[in-house]
């Protein structure tokens, strides 16, 4: 049985950790460097740092903050936001990141993602997917991103059986791209892991979108991190469970319940261990 991972997430805006609901109504949650050190000391398995406005503001990730965070942690650190090129990935790795996630740029320019995977190895590259359920009969974005010449033009567009749509720029831009198809495609480009966020569940504390998580986890052969909706350790257990109705994820990411003190990492792991999930021991 593979060890399951618990991953706190630092969504960073203007140098501060923030958290919202369905990607809006952001509120302050603290200093990223202090929180990183806190979670490392608590026994988190990894840490994710996302500069959530870098892509929409067309700027680079806040390198100096990443460097200061990396100096405080001794667990794997994944960094994303505003990553567009091989050079951007190199800067973040040099600043102390262990893994780099790409989202918007990977959809816009899949070759850039593939080039980064080839340059640094797929163990360093995470594909971040922000997905939203398609409302039956509702509007679907024209997949204008799949312009003539886009390598995924004939494979990725939403079809009659599609259930989730990919969104870019911090959840601001619908794409007309099928999330399940994109996950499989990105794995083929060289992604070593999927960071999958349900926009519908994000921040609501009602549990992960298990259908979405399970569908993508079952479709790819690389690890999947479930994100969006954790309200308690039981929700994480559901996302990590390999039972038919579980999420089949390899890791569970959470923010609100950790940032605002509802649960500690140790409390979470203790409860997950009761669900027969293999966990690395936490620090009290």
Model-derived features with residue positions:
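Hydrophobic faces of well-ordered beta-strands that scaffold small-molecule active sites
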Residues: 4-10, 19, 47-49, 77-81, ...
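Catalytic cores of alpha/beta
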Residues: 73, 77-99, 135, 211-251
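Short, acidic/polar
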Residues: 28-40, 84-90, 175-185, 235-236
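Conserved, mostly hydrophobic/aromatic
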Residues: 11, 39, 47, 79, ...
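C-terminal helical cap(s) of enzyme catalytic domains, especially alpha/beta-barrels
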Residues: 113-120, 240-283
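Alpha-helix-loop-beta-strand connector modules within alpha/beta enzyme cores
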Residues: 57-80, 115-130, 205-231, 275-277
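Glycine-rich, proline-tolerant flexible connector loops at the mouths of alpha/beta enzymes
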Residues: 46-64, 104, 195-206
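Conserved anion-binding
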Residues: 12-14, 18, 97-195, 200-201
